[in-house]
Amino acid sequence: MKTLLLTLVVVTIVCLDLGYTMTCCNQQSSQPKTTTTCAESSCYKKTWRDHRGTIIERGCGCPNVKPGIQLVCCETNECNN
């Protein structure tokens, strides 16, 4: 009986994914879409211009940026594409 109860608890934890993680896009500029699993609860998309043109950086979290860099932070899976 104890074994059955323990098995049910383990299955419940695995199915509920109590350690919820976020999936964020992490490709740079116009590269093909790639994603990563993050421990943070948000994703970001940084955009700026330099001599190469418009540069886009994507990743996990919501970093501080320097003036002149556009930052968009969001809180749903793959929201920074």
UniProtKB/Swiss-Prot annotation:
The record's listing under Pfam families reads:
Toxin_cobra-type (PF21947)
Among InterPro entries, the record links this protein to: Snake_3FTx, Snake_toxin-like_sf, Snake_toxin_con_site, Toxin_cobra-type
The disulfides recorded in the entry are C24-C43, C38-C60, C62-C73, C74-C79
Which tissues show it?
Answer: Expressed by the venom gland.
- The protein's name: Short neurotoxin 1
Spell out the SUPFAM superfamilies in the cross-references. Answer: Snake toxin-like
Signal peptide span per the entry?
Answer: 1-21
Query: What organism is this sequence from?
Result: Austrelaps superbus
Give the subcellular location: Secreted
Provide the primary localization: secreted
